[in-house]
Amino acid sequence: MAREPIIMNKLNLSIAVGNYVRIRPLVDGEVQIDGVDPIFMLQDPEEIFFRAFRHADYDICELSLSSYSVKTAAGTSPYIAVPVFPSRAFRHTSIYIRNDRGIESAADLKGKRIGVPEYQLTANVWVRLFLEEDHGLKASDVTWVRGGYEETGRLEKIVLKLPADVIVENAPETETLSGMLASGELDAVIGPRAPSCFTQGHPKVSYLYRDPQGAASDWYRALSYSRSCTCWGSGARWPSSTLGYPGPLPKHSRSPSP
């Protein structure tokens, strides 16, 4: 007697990711994830990272690569990384300066006050890397001011243990980094997006690199690798035997080209 076919219900999984063009085939249903009935949430990456590491709000989500590394090293990550990278960027476009402070090159940032939305954001880690390797500017050479880009009262989502010579101050609770750069309270801002004072054409705010795309191209030609900024993460509460999860996700994802 023939056996009745076993019908397995698809998993209902919440998936949070930035609104990238390369993700649209998954979000629009053009590409299906095997064994999964996804509920997609397109959100700002910063919100995703905060909710993921503070509250583990999602089954699958885009994760800050540096934040994931810090949490994993501490043994407290609620997610397991999947080696697919939704966002890669060269971050030479991530440094915005006051152009009335005598800052002609990265070396001139020494002794300055630089705003960052979070010290350990992957974009900021990459920037600190090439500032030190290419220009000799160490993290201890500046004063870091942590705060919200456009909203006041932003919190660091994870606890950091920094070297004693690295100074990180909190921005005033009533101030934003964009506002402080516009008013001259900061000499520069580093972050994954342009502050509104820059996009609105403030005359005293500009890129550090006069041609940031050209600087990024030169960097890539010299070193021949791109920078991964985010990865997929699957909730650690899911057993690896569950329909091969998270195996279906990498199968249907493609990392962007450098």
From Swiss-Prot:
GO aspect biological process, one term: phthalate catabolic process
KW Ribosomal protein (keyword) present: no
Family matches, as Pfam families: NMT1
A single GO molecular function term of this UniProt record: 4,5-dihydroxyphthalate decarboxylase activity
Range of residues in the leader sequence: none
Protein's UniProt keywords contain Lyase: yes
EC number: 4.1.1.55
Enzyme class: lyase
Pathway: Xenobiotic degradation; phthalate degradation; 3,4-dihydroxybenzoate from phthalate: step 3/3
Record's catalysed reaction(s): 4,5-dihydroxyphthalate + H(+) = 3,4-dihydroxybenzoate + CO2
Record-linked InterPro entries: SsuA/THI5
Superkingdom in the source lineage: Bacteria
Keywords of this entry: Aromatic hydrocarbons catabolism, Decarboxylase, Lyase, Plasmid
Induction details: Induced by phthalate and repressed by glucose.
Family statement: To P.testosteroni DHP decarboxylase.
Designated name of the protein: 4,5-dihydroxyphthalate decarboxylase
Annotated source species: Pseudomonas putida (Arthrobacter siderocapsulatus)
